[in-house]
């Protein structure tokens, strides 16, 4: 990886256009209500193009996309990064194959993360098994169990990142979920990240409906 870049930067057009299109797609699916969510891509010099704070993802303009360095320091004047930028930076730092990160706030993800588990205690994961769409995550069969980790929400991003780090180091094939908040999913490029998000959201919607039918 290259060292931290400190020069003033504007995102390349391809990166900004890619992020804007991803925001429109996520908004159309109801995964980023109000100004929720954030979207990023890794740039060739290992800086990160990411949505700036406070923008509705369905109405993004390329001028809403900024560049940060590997520590989350803004390099684009006049734009403020989301506090959650640190979580994007962490994923890129710990997974050299990650080329894009998407974070959404769907109803299914939010509700399931807060559903009571055994003895009414909040669960640490959502177990997904038997679904054909699990193959979207690189497995060869539906006859497998994958767990989606759930982290307790925290407004202190450094503390939240410290909780996420061991999960990322062990490997998180589905991504991870922040309780009452939303999912983080990533892939080699934006198309892969969005496909994984779509697969995960389908699985969570199925799981929510299955629990209703119990």
UniProtKB/Swiss-Prot annotation:
The keyword Magnesium does not apply. The keyword Metal-binding applies. SMART domains: Aldolase_II. Gene3D superfamilies: Class II aldolase/adducin N-terminal domain. It catalyses: 5-(methylsulfanyl)-D-ribulose 1-phosphate = 5-methylsulfanyl-2,3-dioxopentyl phosphate + H2O. Its EC number is 4.2.1.109. Pathway: Amino-acid biosynthesis; L-methionine biosynthesis via salvage pathway; L-methionine from S-methyl-5-thio-alpha-D-ribose 1-phosphate: step 2/6. Binds 1 zinc ion per subunit. InterPro entries: Aldolase_class_II_sugar_metab, Aldolase_II/adducin_N, Aldolase_II/adducin_N_sf, MethylthioRu-1-P_deHdtase_MtnB. Pfam families: Aldolase_II (PF00596). GO terms for molecular function: aldehyde-lyase activity; methylthioribulose 1-phosphate dehydratase activity; zinc ion binding. It is an enzyme of class 4 (lyase). GO terms for biological process: L-methionine salvage from methylthioadenosine; pentose catabolic process. Keywords: Amino-acid biosynthesis, Lyase, Metal-binding, Methionine biosynthesis, Zinc. Zn(2+) binds at residues 103, 105. One of its GO terms (cellular component) is cytosol. It comes from the Bacteria. Its cofactor is Zn(2+). NCBIfam families: PRK09220.1 (NF006672), salvage_mtnB (TIGR03328). Belongs to the aldolase class II family. MtnB subfamily. Catalyzes the dehydration of methylthioribulose-1-phosphate (MTRu-1-P) into 2,3-diketo-5-methylthiopentyl-1-phosphate (DK-MTP-1-P). This is Methylthioribulose-1-phosphate dehydratase.
């Amino acid at each position: 990886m290259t060292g931290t870049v400190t020069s003033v930067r504007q995102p390349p057009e391809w990166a900004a256009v890619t992020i804007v299109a991803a925001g429109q797609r996520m908004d159309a699916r109801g995964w980023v209500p109000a100004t929720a969510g954030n979207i990023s891509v890794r740039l060739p010099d290992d800086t990160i193009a990411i949505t700036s704070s406070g923008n509705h993802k369905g109405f993004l303009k390329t001028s809403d996309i900024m560049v940060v360095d590997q520590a989350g320091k803004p390099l684009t004047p006049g734009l403020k990064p989301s506090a959650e930028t640190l979580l994007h930076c962490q994923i890129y730092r710990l997974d050299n194959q990650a080329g894009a990160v998407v974070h959404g706030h769907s109803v299914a993800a939010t509700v399931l993360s807060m559903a009571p588990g055994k003895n009414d205690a909040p669960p640490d994961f959502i177990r997904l098994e038997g679904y054909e769409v699990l193959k979207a995550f690189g497995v060869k069969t539906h006859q497998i169990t994958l767990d989606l980790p759930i982290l307790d929400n925290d407004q202190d991003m450094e503390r939240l990142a410290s909780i996420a780090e061991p999960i990322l180091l062990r490997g998180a094939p589905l991504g991870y979920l922040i309780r009452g908040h939303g999912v983080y999913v990533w892939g080699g490029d934006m198309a892969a990240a969005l496909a994984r998000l779509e697969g995960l959201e389908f699985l969570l919607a199925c799981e929510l409906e299955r629990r209703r039918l119990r």
